[in-house]
């Protein structure tokens, strides 16, 4: 399997600590730089969205859910790809994946290899000047 440059930065947002750690291990095995956040609020307050190449987020979280996070991200970084991992895909009814909001959806449980492929595709679609790898 091809390793990725360590300069690709992936933010992972989920209120489930075990899922955060599982995704961290998966992504670090492919040499991604991983930033973990236990809430959407924590990501938004971190100020690191501008330096992030892709966001992976749960949808159902307290205070700010994944859909509101998507809106906040795209208000400041419209081309930043967002990948949802969720047990509740029905919450996305009416939104068009891979449309102007640049998101993909994986239902929990998901296959790690499929998530890695989605991340690879997402960072390859970044404008050339935004690619770090």
Model-derived features with residue positions:
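Non-catalytic signal-transmission and effector/linker regions of two-component phosphorelay proteins
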Residues: 1-11, 17-24, 45, 71, ...
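Receiver (REC) domain active-site loop signature in two-component systems and cognate sites
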Residues: 61
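Acidic, metal-coordinating helix/loop segments flanking the phosphotransfer/catalytic sites
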Residues: 36-54
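Alpha4 helix (beta4-alpha4-beta5 surface) of REC/receiver domains from two-component response regulators
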Residues: 68, 88-107, 113, 117
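Acidic catalytic/metal-coordinating carboxylates
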Residues: 38-39, 65-68
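Two-component/phosphorelay signaling modules centered on CheY-like receiver
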Residues: 17-35, 103
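Active-site T/S-Asp motif of two-component receiver
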Residues: 57-58
